[in-house]
């Protein structure tokens, strides 16, 4: 389920905070109100992405360009592919879609992989802060792109990780 609104909701913020307190990372899309400002000077705010306790994910394309629709602000934590994403569509069809709602699940999946590896290696469940730190170990920043556009960058699990662009 995708959710995003321009107005803060105490109930939604409380739900996010409570989930994180219980060890459940809350990964959300940053929002699709971006205006294509590559310098990140324009701030587009969406909730729950603007909550400190949520992990906000913006979108990039396959060429490592920030998607023009992806929100930019100080709350963006990571970016992931969110342009020309192949997905199931009604009536047994497939479609190419775009949006930060398609980028966020890639970060969620990355967290699941890291959590399982942590459990296998250390024989205990990591807390949300440890998971976030593990995720950060596998990020790569896009050069010459404002931090408000990409947060810590994109996830790279490849063996020979190299800086892009």
Please describe what each predicted stretch is.
Residues 1-53, 63, 72, 90-104, ...:
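Substrate-binding/access-modulating region of protease and related hydrolase catalytic domains
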Residues 76-77, 155:
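Substrate-binding/active-site groove segments that recognize
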Residues 24, 82-150, 154, 160-162:
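Hydrolase catalytic cores
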Residues 4, 31, 159-165:
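Secreted peptidase-domain scaffold signal
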Residues 60:
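Carbohydrate-associated surface elements
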Residues 20, 51-54, 63-64, 71-75, ...:
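Subtilisin-like serine protease catalytic core
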């Amino acid at each position: 389920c995708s959710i995003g609104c321009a107005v803060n909701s105490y109930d939604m913020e409380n739900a996010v905070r409570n989930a994180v307190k219980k060890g459940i990372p809350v990964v959300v899309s940053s929002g699709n109100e971006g205006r294509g400002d590559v310098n990140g000077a324009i701030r587009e705010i969406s909730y729950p992405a603007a909550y400190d306790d949520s992990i906000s994910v913006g979108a990039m394309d396959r060429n490592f360009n920030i998607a023009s629709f992806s929100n930019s602000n100080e709350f963006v934590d990571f970016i992931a592919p969110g342009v020309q994403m192949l997905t199931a569509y009604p009536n047994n069809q497939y479609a190419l879609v775009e949006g930060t709602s398609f980028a966020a699940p890639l970060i969620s999946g990355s967290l699941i992989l890291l959590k399982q590896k942590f459990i296998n290696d250390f024989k205990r469940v990591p807390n949300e802060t440890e998971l976030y730190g593990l995720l950060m170990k596998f990020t790569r920043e896009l050069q010459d792109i404002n931090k408000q556009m990409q947060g810590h960058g994109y996830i790279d699990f490849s063996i020979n990780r190299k800086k892009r662009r």
